[in-house]
Amino acid sequence: MRLTVLCAVCLLPGSLALPLPQEAGGMSELQWEQAQDYLKRFYLYDSETKNANSLEAKLKEMQKFFGLPITGMLNSRVIEIMQKPRCGVPDVAEYSLFPNSPKWTSKVVTYRIVSYTRDLPHITVDRLVSKALNMWGKEIPLHFRKVVWGTADIMIGFARGAHGDSYPFDGPGNTLAHAFAPGTGLGGDAHFDEDERWTDGSSLGINFLYAATHELGHSLGMGHSSDPNAVMYPTYGNGDPQNFKLSQDDIKGIQKLYGKRSNSRKK
């Protein structure tokens, strides 16, 4: 099951200087520009060389993350992955936490749904958000409490285009949603693009439970995983709703951050 859910954190601006080599056959100018933009947003620096200006180093990081041959060259497979809808958080190997491992210090985390999609009944959105949070909550010593007014730790909503957080949505496809790591202000908040077609899994469109579970993982402090079976894998795909669950990689990551729930099932 591939999961491409979309989220955003405070991404650092970066400059791209060196041209990208490519395999025989060439790429269109649009693909070239898309590749540079993709690497700029999702691979902020090379973990070994720390060369923030080397596009080739960034491309190698991407190829390593997705299990591709590490050539540092653009090819059709790389472009195919770059064109998939995905989350706005940079990629790392296996499970990861945000820099400095931000997390909620209170054992009770509040959440509020401030706006809803037109695609689903309010009661369905409420149920799926609760289910997504409980998937994480049953593994860690946190409790989630819904509030209906005021400021909650996690503010959840649907919006189109620019919506006040410097990360405007881009219409159908591409960026589906974004979320912020635990903290003050926007910290923990999760936003979903209302230009998408959201479903409960019973019709064509983006399965909201999949997206919400991924985004709320970010709201709890989780980064991306390179494990294709993980909820925190950066790309989206419709799997079997009846068998949707956290992977061992997801559980290992969230318990690294918060510890195990006393009644969490043994692994």
UniProtKB/Swiss-Prot annotation:
Motif (Cysteine switch) on chain: 85-92
Check the record and name the CDD domains matching this protein.
ZnMc_MMP
Q: Which Pfam families match?
A: Peptidase_M10, PG_binding_1
Q: Where does Zn(2+) 1 bind?
A: 163, 165, 178, 191
Q: Where does Zn(2+) 2 bind?
A: 87, 214, 218, 224
Names of the cofactor(s) = Ca(2+); Zn(2+)
Q: What is its EC number?
A: 3.4.24.23
What keywords sit in the KW lines? Calcium, Collagen degradation, Extracellular matrix, Hydrolase, Metal-binding, Metalloprotease, Protease, Secreted, Signal, Zinc, Zymogen
Please give an example of a GO cellular component term from this record: extracellular space
Q: Propeptide residues, per UniProt?
A: 18-94
Q: Which residues does Ca(2+) 1 bind?
A: 153, 185, 187, 189
Q: Which reaction does it catalyse?
A: Cleavage of 14-Ala-|-Leu-15 and 16-Tyr-|-Leu-17 in B chain of insulin. No action on collagen types I, II, IV, V. Cleaves gelatin chain alpha2(I) > alpha1(I)
Question: What residues bind Ca(2+) 2, as annotated?
Answer: 170-171, 173, 175, 193, 196
**Chief localization class?**
secreted
For this protein, the record's Gene3D superfamilies field holds: Collagenase (Catalytic Domain)
Q: What class of enzyme is it?
A: hydrolase
Which residues constitute the signal peptide according to the record? 1-17
Enumerate the GO terms in the molecular function aspect: endopeptidase activity; metalloendopeptidase activity; metallopeptidase activity; serine-type endopeptidase activity; zinc ion binding
Source taxon at top rank: Eukaryota
Q: Which GO terms describe its biological process?
A: antibacterial peptide biosynthetic process; antibacterial peptide secretion; collagen catabolic process; defense response to Gram-negative bacterium; defense response to Gram-positive bacterium; extracellular matrix disassembly; extracellular matrix organization; membrane protein ectodomain proteolysis
Q: Which residues form the active site?
A: 215
| Entries under InterPro entries matching the protein | M10A_MMP, MetalloPept_cat_dom_sf, Pept_M10_metallopeptidase, Pept_M10A, Pept_M10A_Zn_BS, Peptidase_Metallo, Peptidoglycan-bd-like, PGBD-like_sf
Its family remark reads: Belongs to the peptidase M10A family.
What is stated about domains?
The conserved cysteine present in the cysteine-switch motif binds the catalytic zinc ion, thus inhibiting the enzyme. The dissociation of the cysteine from the zinc ion upon the activation-peptide release activates the enzyme.
Q: What is this protein called?
A: Matrilysin
Q: Which organism is it from?
A: Homo sapiens
Gene that this sequence comes from: MMP7
